Amino acid sequence: PLYSSAASDVYKRQDAFKAAIGDRVAKAMKVKYAFQQLEELPAGFAVPEGRVKPWGTCHAVLAAKDLIDGPFAVINADDYYGPEAFRVMYDYLSTHEDGSYYDYCMVSYLLRNTVSENGSVARGVCVTDPDGTLHSVTERTRIETYENGVHFTEDGGESWTDLPGDTPVSMNLWGFGKSFLDEAEQR
């Protein structure tokens, strides 16, 4: 979904998106559009006075809920996942029953394969069981390489914490059943 705070902006953004990406993708698959509106919130929620920033990924997914009729993936447009990641996601979503409590999936990567020599990156640092069950994701907004490996800071660089290169990280490639939408509306 595309974000807009004014109805007239929706059409400008829609046309720009279609021209840059949508028309090309539409040659290979069916394309539908949903637009993230700041004011469109689940019952019981309100926009705080002065807020102009979009709500985030979950709100964007909820903006598309009327277009979702089965399992679906959520990706960031600014990351490249590679074809294998989409194959893994498809295999999972096409073989799992919807409705299992929190039976969702995420494609993770080894941290060492996702860092840049040209500056910092933001990643979701994952805590998993040995069997791969995800327990938590903590966003680290400034992860950098240095001569001894990889580390992150949360205080503007005053202190750093090392991260092993084999740490699983999220680049926001998630898979859900349609039932996730009900859960998302409650939160």
Located regions from the model:
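Acidic helix N-cap motif at the loop->helix transition within catalytic regions
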Residues: D15-I21
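Hydrophobic/aromatic residue at the end of a short beta strand that borders the catalytic acidic motif
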Residues: Y81-G82, F176
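A C-terminal functional module that forms or caps the active site or interfaces directly
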Residues: E185-R187
